[in-house]
Amino acid sequence: MSKVAVITGTNSNLGLNIAYRLLEKIPFSEDITIVVTSRTLPRVRECIELINKFHSQLERSGSLSFDYILVDFTDMVSILNAYNTLSKKYARLDYFFVNAAQGAYSGIDWFGAVKEILVSPMKAVTNPKYKIQKVGVKSDDGMGLVFQANVFGPYYFIHKLKPLMKKGNCKVIWVSSLTAKSEYLNTNDLQLLESDMSYEASKRLVDILHYATYEELAKDGIHQYLTHPGIFTSRSFYQYLNVFTYFSMLALFYIARFCGSCWHNISGYKAANAIVHCATSDVSALDNTIKFGSATTKTGKEYVDFDKSFQCPDSEKDAVKLYFEDLRNEWDLKLKDQIKDTRKP
């Protein structure tokens, strides 16, 4: 039976490289179906073409099949429809990568960027604060846009897909961030509507949610892991860079790596290492209580590092879990009789 892998945000640099590395790491005799997700059909076609091209270079005897769902994680009806499509076609899911992410960016504070680079260059290219993010942006569903796109939307999707995941002893891999610091999240603002660092706060929320839910999922045979890709070149910010600033950024990344930063992977392929490591390693060799990070040496040799530093009071984890469960139940009621065909763009 062909294994089934759902990769959210497949059309991103990281999403494509998750697919590439997964094909390299699973047994070459194994049949697999990759479910490409995107908001638009042209991007789906582009992804399938690129993954097929990569696969043709591998000496695999197992077959590769493709499927797709059009899903927007800032639209709850879209998520429900995507679930309906998958539940009709598949009896089980084996891999589920929570990679789709969105930020409410509006530009770069160039004065702040120059100052930060001069004062603390390593911090400036590892945990920057000069990216300008809009405050108070809501989705059409009335929730915090970044909260819904990065955390609640995927969480709700997983909730709906649990029966399929249970049958496949699915591995759920959340992609967090190196910047998921506790200082960015106000637990009185879980929808991140008051935050000017909503992207980073959403990733901190991902961390808390993982630690609050992985044990419960394990009871159903669903294995959930927390990862981060380190620092790499992402297309999400290209619109704010010109040729000079882009190559300056790359140069700073390489300098940071040479100076000892293990997190500057730079390439999307190396950034996907820890993510696929968790997906393809034996469960007995993995630990749900740590955060797996993609890392490299000064010379660019890749490896998987481990972060055991997560700290969060149990009361905070319990409060976050309860908030998500209540919101999930609320949307279960709202979404009755809302299913449509996801294959109509």
Which stretches of residues belong to each language-model region?
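NAD(P)H-dependent oxidoreductase Rossmann-fold/reductase module
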Residues: 1-81, 85-94, 103, 171, ...
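A short, exposed helix-loop element centered on a Lys and neighboring polar residues
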Residues: 158-159, 211
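Conserved NAD(P)H cofactor-binding loop of Rossmann-fold oxidoreductase domains
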Residues: 97-134
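Helix-to-beta-strand junctions that scaffold the AdoMet/dcAdoMet cofactor pocket
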Residues: 165-168
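A hydrophobic alpha-helix adjacent to the NAD(P)-binding/active-site core of NAD(P)-dependent oxidoreductases
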Residues: 135, 146-147
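Juxtamembrane membrane-interface segments at transmembrane-helix boundaries in membrane proteins
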Residues: 136-140
